[in-house]
Amino acid sequence: MPLYFSAHTTACLTKQALRELMKGLLTATDMKVRRCVASQLGGRMLTEVEAPNQPTLEKWFIARRINCEWIMRLDLDGKDGTVTEY
């Protein structure tokens, strides 16, 4: 399954609201959200999501009323001295 990073604006959300938003994404059953990171001060959230394609992922975020700044499909992932191709 293709892997995507996405960036979102979260301005004015409290830490509690951000936490609830992230929990909701991570426990979703219709899309596999691998990871969420957020900065309350920066007003931004990043997600790492497995999705069949970008249009489906865009519609998924729209259905949840989550603003997307950008979505990027990942081709290469480097960690622990190894590069993996998707």
Model-assigned labels for residue ranges:
Residues 29, 64-67:
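Short, structured coil segments at secondary-structure junctions
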Residues 57-62:
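Charge-rich, low-aromatic oligomerization/scaffolding segments with amphipathic character
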